[in-house]
Curated annotation (Swiss-Prot):
InterPro entries: aa-tRNA-synth_II (IPR006195), aa-tRNA-synth_II/BPL/LPL (IPR045864), Phe-tRNA-synth_IIc_asu (IPR004529), Phenylalanyl-tRNA_Synthase (IPR002319), PheRS_DBD3 (IPR040725). One of its GO terms (molecular function) is ATP binding. This is Probable phenylalanine--tRNA ligase alpha subunit. Its EC number is 6.1.1.20. Its cofactor is Mg(2+). One of its GO terms (cellular component) is cytosol.
Length: 474
């Protein structure tokens, strides 16, 4: 007999039964009750009540008797030696307390006749749910029972009890045409049932800020560059930007070098010759680096350390045709072999802006940066003179982080050197200004995050991502 049949059978001769009348666990009973109630065969309510259960020691005493009772039964007519009594340490104290035994000389003798194992009887009452206040207090004190909660279900007959319980869940055209539906029991709609909460994706705060920054660039008249090359050659990442081949940043401590393929052969020959000349002997009023330039060093593949490598590719294409000024931007991933701390990661997203036009000045660059950061909502910014191999003059950009209560670097900027622009074929009066900004730092400022590892990495709280506010910059 199934559990549902057992419940219906018990209800035959009474209006109400309790779950205690059914020998089954609560977690097994509940889904069966829900199923029967949904068909209106039964209805049920429940109530929580306090019960007491036996501990492991209590179960042992219920089975084998209490320690004091067992000691009493072990003492013969000739008594028991004290050393032997000591073996019954757990029962000795209570046996003396109950005056079941007495000490005479070096032996212990019975001092009562026909004693009853009260502790075992109390435990038996507990198993039968007969609770006496004094007994419960004593058993709890001896840690033979513990308190627990029990759910008791009160089950009654429903409107459809005793009727055909096979409720129809689907109405089909055949039932309507034949009129059969008039004689069928349809399962009623339950409008109070809550549907399952569907899991859903959530945009990471970085992606929210990225999209807003992209909108800002587009509002300022910039066009997006193609930056789908995570792997670059040292030629585009360093050499085209007039970075010496013996520069410290090209060392393995700052750069991730590719193992396979370790080198590239796709370098424009004519442009490569111009780059070699500007590095080794100089040109266009520049003295170069006064050092040899090795093509093998330029062919080494790396994970790009900045998206400026994509900027040089784009500027080279602009220089090939009739000159037209351009405002370009990109937001993409870059990689640097740096020590990890609260504000640095080995891979991060770089926001890059590039303007190529005639007659540009450092004032133009500062104006664009101030306007850009104002749109981001970061009004507290300042500039600091800096050095970059490919820009002169150069500036670091700092924003004030209210959480860390200090200024943190949010980007770098500068005017591209003639040694970068002239080998591409640009005229002398063509200037280019560029700025590279971290996407993570403005995001940290926007969302009040002080440790970048709370934003990216294995320790990020998924609830933070789900509940992070939409990003709007005023």
């Amino acid at each position: 007999m199934s559990l549902s049949q057992k419940i219906l059978e018990l209800l035959k001769n009474t209006e109400t039964i309790k779950s205690t009348d059914i020998d089954v666990r609560s977690n097994e009973l509940y889904p069966v009750l829900l199923s029967l109630a949904s068909k209106e065969i039964i209805s049920f309510t429940f109530k929580e009540q306090i019960i007491y259960k036996l501990t492991e020691e209590g179960e042992s005493i219920l089975k084998n008797g209490s320690y004091e009772f067992n000691l009493y039964n072990s003492i013969g007519d000739n008594g028991m030696e004290l050393l032997e009594v000591d073996k019954y340490n757990l029962g000795k104290v209570n046996a003396f307390k109950n005056k079941w035994i007495k000490k005479v000389g070096d032996k212990v003798y019975k001092s009562a006749d026909n004693v009853e194992d009260n502790v075992k009887n109390m435990l038996n009452n507990v198993t039968n749910k007969i609770y006496q206040k004094e007994e419960i207090s004593l058993l709890k004190k001896r840690k033979l029972i513990y308190q627990a909660k029990e759910v008791v279900y009160f089950i009654k007959k429903g409107p459809l009890y005793g009727k055909d319980s096979d409720n129809i869940t689907e109405l089909i055209s055949k039932m309507v045409i034949s009129g059969e539906y008039k004689h069928l029991n349809f399962k009623p709609y339950n409008f109070n049932t809550k549907g399952n909460i569907q899991s859903q994706g959530a945009l990471h705060p970085l992606m929210k800020v990225r999209e807003e920054i992209r909108k800002i660039f587009l509002e300022m008249g910039f066009n997006e560059m193609t930056t789908n090359k995570f792997v670059e050659s040292s030629f585009w990442n360093f050499d085209t930007l007039f970075q010496p081949q013996n520069h410290p940043s090209r060392d393995a401590h700052d750069t991730f070098f590719m193992k396979t393929p370790s080198t590239t052969s796709y370098i424009p020959i004519d442009y490569m010759k111009m780059i070699k000349k500007i590095h080794s002997v100089g040109d266009f009023d520049s003295d170069g680096h006064f050092s040899d330039w090795d093509i093998k060093e330029a062919e080494k593949n790396i994970l790009r350390s900045h998206t400026t490598a994509c900027s040089t590719r784009t500027m080279l294409e602009i220089a090939k045709g009739e000159f037209i000024s351009a405002k370009l931007f990109s937001i993409d991933r870059v990689f640097r072999n740096e020590a990890l701390d609260a504000t640095h990661l080995a891979e991060f997203n770089q926001v890059e802006g590039l303007i190529v036009a005639k007659g540009l000045t450092l004032g133009n660059l500062m104006g664009y940066l101030k306007r850009f950061f104002e749109k981001l909502g970061i009004t507290d910014i300042k500039f600091k003179p800096a050095y970059n191999p490919y820009t002169e003059p150069s500036m670091e950009v700092f924003g004030y982080h209210k959480g860390l209560k200090k200024w943190i670097e949010v980007g770098n900027s500068g005017m591209f050197r003639p040694e970068v622009l002239r080998p591409m074929g640009f005229d002398k009066d063509v200037r280019a200004i560029g700025f590279g900004l971290s996407l993570e730092r403005p995001t940290m400022i926007k969302y009040g995050i002080s440790n970048i590892r709370d934003l990216i990495g294995p320790k990020v709280d998924i609830e933070f991502i789900k509940k992070s506010e939409m990003c709007f910059f005023n």
